[in-house]
Amino acid sequence: MKILERSLKTCPIVQRGEYTYFIHPISDGVPLIKPDLIREITTEIIKIGDLNVDKIITAEAMGIPLATAISLCTDIPYAIIRKREYKLDGEIAVHQETGYSKGELYLNGVNKGDKVIIVDDVLSTGGTIIALIEALRKAGAEIKDIICVIERGDGKKIVKEKTGHTVKTLMKIDVIDGKVVIL
């Protein structure tokens, strides 16, 4: 994971109110998402993930490039939990709260009995993953695995406590003195 580590150590840091953000291609789509970074992450997720599944599930927006790359390499279709309602038959709405926002998320394209893997860009507070798990449980899906690329904060512990699910992550970080530190 040398490319991911190098890119994290050199990414810009911005302060918004009380929260310190790291700006990274995987979490923000800027400054530029390079193919070697996506390739490295995709290869690692395929290596460690339980891909004996019917569908890959991700959250809008930055989980989409990851799910797309994994889908192209594995021929497993993916569904996106969206921030917008489509009012399709069987659509499932769940409430999401993260460290910086709250709102509704909408799941379509998942059926009872589907085996799924969840992939996402960042795990910090656990709010997005908890909402995904809730939606998938309502749909009657079986969650086989959960993988997030970057871990920051206590989200892994919070998800385990609130849902019983373990989240795998590729790299744990913190922002200390205006820099990303790999833990």
Swiss-Prot record:
EC class of the enzyme, as a word: transferase
Any single Gene Ontology cellular-component annotation: cytoplasm
Gene3D superfamilies: 3.40.50.2020
Catalytic reaction list: IMP + diphosphate = hypoxanthine + 5-phospho-alpha-D-ribose 1-diphosphate; GMP + diphosphate = guanine + 5-phospho-alpha-D-ribose 1-diphosphate
Keyword annotations from UniProtKB, A to Z: Cytoplasm, Glycosyltransferase, Purine salvage, Transferase
Oligomer status and interactors: Homodimer.
UniProt name for this protein: Hypoxanthine/guanine phosphoribosyltransferase
Annotated organism of origin: Methanococcus aeolicus (strain ATCC BAA-1280 / DSM 17508 / OCM 812 / Nankai-3)
Recorded name of the encoding gene: hpt
